[in-house]
């Protein structure tokens, strides 16, 4: 073979660590993994070629950056769980012929599939489906990708698969696409872009967790479907570890702790998804609001208040009404005494109200930036199956701020908003925070407001601010709001789960729609840029996540009851009451337990109530004029004078440590 032929038959691949390997042209991801090591080949699920996720057995035909994908990565887990959803669908089809399938994606913690079936699934069905999935896995069925013309795919899903849901996707969502891809596994096939596992045999353990109700395409006017959730793993060991984490998650469930610690309640008489804050929970929320208000005051924010409802024309102008119409409560229709009709909406967003505040008077460039802020309650008609205590509610309060600035001030203001968000998360103990730059999808420009040029500038500004702040980020194409790109902050809690909480959004669109302006140094009108900013996001969601992150063990400054005085015997009650009074006067949230119970029981109940400080008072303490301090989960801390204790607690509270 000539040197030229050898060069043509060999390609250079670059691995993530920078290593360059020469391999034969046409080598697959599996071949490359095997050339690195058998262990990696055994663990390989897929491959990325120049950053694009691809099936493991797809050939690599030219020089490329290559990364072998395993279950250790989020991408690997997504691919594994997506394939598991296909295996579950095949199992359901084999057990319950005639079942049809809607959407079946991977999720953050597993997968689900929406199933249309005459059979009403029960708990025992889940166990049967699990066994069938493991049986399919043992068959070692290869997953085969097939590309076909969209018109041929319509014919296939109409006559062969008899699946009206996939036909609808092909005729609607994919109507502008010429070629689509299918994945076959034995007699089962599904419409899918992939990639997928090379074989069903990679699935070694599975747990189907629950069933909920859903609607086809999330539209309550469409067919009702049954959503089956599950998770799968490449080993039994990983499943056992997952089950252990789930048990811990149950212990930390904010709905459970919210009841036990008397933080909030949910009542069907009030309405689904409308949480009510009880006194202790209200303390937590109030302290968080005070914390942010104090910090915002230092940073030049101006507080405002707006109504809970607004004229529907306001939200049509902003675009929120058509954009959020599927998740809004129906309009309220009002007729005045002259018969004139007006329609109002429960407020879905605070921003249109703030824009009108800005435009209520002439603004100068010398006035900018203007930073308006509000803890504003908004309402979304979430599907009942999606409601989840505080973290997914129909009525919730946003720590919403809108910053109106000149284009020249924009990057500085984004940086300031990022800094505030990082400060909030750091204070509240969220040390692991991922940052996503949520960009628009250029292939779906009609989904967004504004021109392509406006979006290009907005995304450039967001990147510049993120780079200036030195934050690590990843890009989320298609994750932007309809009016602009976002910086989304995703925290990892104590159980390793990810929650999208705070956000910073850039908006060139709303200033156009609301004709916002300021007078520049040249005496002419100019258009401001708007930043939407919410470190907490939703107060309810944030507190729900915080409850689970801390397991209800709040820091002293945030605890609903910061201390409890525990007299050992009745003869020291008077001394205990003087301590209680002194702590109250110092601004400490303190209770006193004068029940005729043994001190051990009082301490145990205070520990269960997660009260940070237990102040033990007996004859010895009374005689010495001191107290004995016990800290929650830490035990005995020694003796202190009352003034000394107050100084220690006030310092810890003021520093919010």
UniProtKB/Swiss-Prot annotation:
Residue ranges annotated for the TGS domain, each copy included: 7-70
Localization (cell): Cytoplasm
Reactions mediated catalytically: tRNA(Thr) + L-threonine + ATP = L-threonyl-tRNA(Thr) + AMP + diphosphate + H(+)
Catalytic: annotated span: 253-555
GO terms for MF: ATP binding; metal ion binding; threonine-tRNA ligase activity; tRNA binding
EC number(s) recorded for this UniProt protein: 6.1.1.3
Keywords: Aminoacyl-tRNA synthetase, ATP-binding, Cytoplasm, Ligase, Metal-binding, Nucleotide-binding, Protein biosynthesis, RNA-binding, tRNA-binding, Zinc
CDD domains (UniProt xref): TGS_ThrRS, ThrRS_anticodon, ThrRS_core
Cofactor remark: Binds 1 zinc ion per subunit.
InterPro entries assigned to the protein according to its UniProt record, in alphabetical order: aa-tRNA-synt_IIb, aa-tRNA-synth_II, aa-tRNA-synth_II/BPL/LPL, Anticodon-bd, Anticodon-bd_dom_sf, Beta-grasp_dom_sf, TGS, TGS-like
GO CC field: cytoplasm
Enzyme kind, highest EC tier: ligase
SUPFAM superfamilies: Class II aaRS ABD-related, Class II aaRS and biotin synthetases, TGS-like, ThrRS/AlaRS common domain
GO terms for biological process, alphabetical: threonyl-tRNA aminoacylation
Residues engaged in binding Zn(2+): 351, 402, 532
Cofactor(s) named in the record: Zn(2+)
Main location: cytoplasm
Family designation: Belongs to the class-II aminoacyl-tRNA synthetase family.
Function noted in UniProt: Catalyzes the attachment of threonine to tRNA(Thr) in a two-step reaction: L-threonine is first activated by ATP to form Thr-AMP and then transferred to the acceptor end of tRNA(Thr). Also edits incorrectly charged L-seryl-tRNA(Thr).
Self-association state and partner proteins as the record states: Homodimer.
Name by which UniProt lists this protein: Threonine--tRNA ligase
Organism: Chlorobium limicola (strain DSM 245 / NBRC 103803 / 6330)
């Amino acid at each position: 073979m000539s040197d030229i032929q050898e060069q043509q038959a060999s390609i250079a691949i670059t691995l993530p660590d920078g290593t360059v390997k020469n391999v034969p042209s046409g080598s697959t991801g599996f071949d490359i993994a095997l050339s690195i090591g058998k262990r990696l080949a055994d663990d390989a699920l897929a491959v990325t070629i120049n950053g694009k996720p691809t099936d493991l057995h797809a050939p690599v035909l030219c020089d490329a950056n290559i990364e072998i994908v395993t279950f250790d990565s989020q991408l690997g887990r997504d691919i594994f769980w997506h394939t598991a959803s296909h295996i579950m669908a095949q199992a359901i089809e084999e057990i319950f012929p005639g079942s049809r399938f809607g959407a079946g994606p991977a999720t953050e913690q597993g997968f689900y599939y929406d199933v249309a079936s005459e059979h009403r699934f029960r708990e025992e069905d889940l166990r049967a489906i699990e066994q069938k999935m493991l049986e399919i896995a043992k068959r070692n069925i290869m997953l085969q990708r097939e590309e076909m013309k969209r018109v041929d795919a319509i014919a296939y899903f109409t006559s062969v698969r008899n699946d009206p849901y996939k036909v609808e996707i092909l005729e609607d969502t994919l109507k502008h696409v010429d070629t689509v891809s299918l994945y076959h596994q034995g007699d089962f096939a599904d419409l899918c872009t992939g990639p997928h596992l090379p074989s069903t045999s990679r699935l070694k353990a599975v747990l189907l967790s629950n069933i909920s109700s859903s609607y086809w395409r999330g539209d309550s006017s469409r067919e009702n479907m049954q959503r089956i959730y599950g998770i799968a793993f490449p080993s039994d060991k990983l499943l056992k570890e997952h089950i252990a984490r789930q048990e811990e998650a149950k212990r930390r469930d904010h709905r459970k702790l919210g009841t036990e610690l008397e933080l909030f309640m949910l009542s069907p008489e009030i309405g689904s998804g409308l949480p009510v804050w009880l006194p202790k929970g209200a303390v937590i929320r109030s302290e968080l609001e005070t914390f942010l208000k104090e910090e915002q005051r230092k940073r030049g924010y101006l507080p405002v208040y707006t109504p809970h409802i607004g004229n529907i024309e306001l939200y049509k102008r902003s675009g929120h009404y058509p954009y959020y119409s599927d998740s809004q409560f129906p309009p309220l229709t009002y007729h005045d005494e002259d018969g004139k009709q007006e329609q109002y909406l429960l407020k879905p967003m605070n921003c249109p109200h703030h824009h009108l505040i800005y435009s209520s008077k002439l603004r100068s460039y010398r006035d900018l930036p203007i930073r308006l802020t509000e803890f504003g309650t908004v309402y979304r008609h979430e599907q009942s199956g999606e409601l989840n205590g505080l973290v997914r509610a129909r009525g919730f309060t946003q720590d919403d701020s809108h910053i109106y600035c000149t284009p020249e001030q924009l990057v500085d203001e984004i940086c300031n908003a990022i800094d505030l968000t990082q400060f909030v998360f750091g204070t509240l103990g969220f040390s692991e925070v991922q940052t996503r730059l949520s960009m628009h999808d250029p292939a779906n420009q009609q989904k967004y407001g504004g021109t392509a040029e406006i979006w290009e500038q907005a995304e450039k500004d967001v990147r510049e601010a993120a780079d200036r702040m030195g934050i690590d980020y990843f890009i989320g194409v298609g994750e932007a709001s309809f009016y602009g790109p976002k910086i989304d902050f995703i925290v990892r809690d104590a159980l390793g789960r990810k929650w999208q909480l705070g956000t910073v959004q850039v908006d060139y669109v709303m200033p156009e729609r609301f004709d916002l302006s300021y007078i520049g140094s040249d005496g002419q009108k100019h258009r401001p840029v708007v930043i939407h900013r919410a470190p907490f996001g939703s107060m309810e969601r944030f507190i729900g996540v915080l409850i689970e992150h801390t397991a209800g063990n709040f820091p002293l400054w945030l605890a609903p009851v910061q201390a409890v005085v525990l007299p050992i015997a009745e003869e020291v009650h008077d001394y205990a009451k003087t301590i209680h009074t002194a702590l109250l006067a110092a601004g400490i949230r303190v209770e006193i337990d004068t029940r005729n119970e043994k001190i051990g029981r009082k301490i145990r109940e205070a520990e269960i109530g997660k009260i940070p400080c237990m102040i033990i008072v007996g004859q010895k303490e009374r005689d010495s004029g001191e107290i004995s301090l016990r800290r929650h989960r830490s035990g005995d801390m020694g003796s202190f004078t009352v003034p000394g204790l107050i100084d220690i607690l006030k310092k810890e509270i003021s520093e919010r440590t």
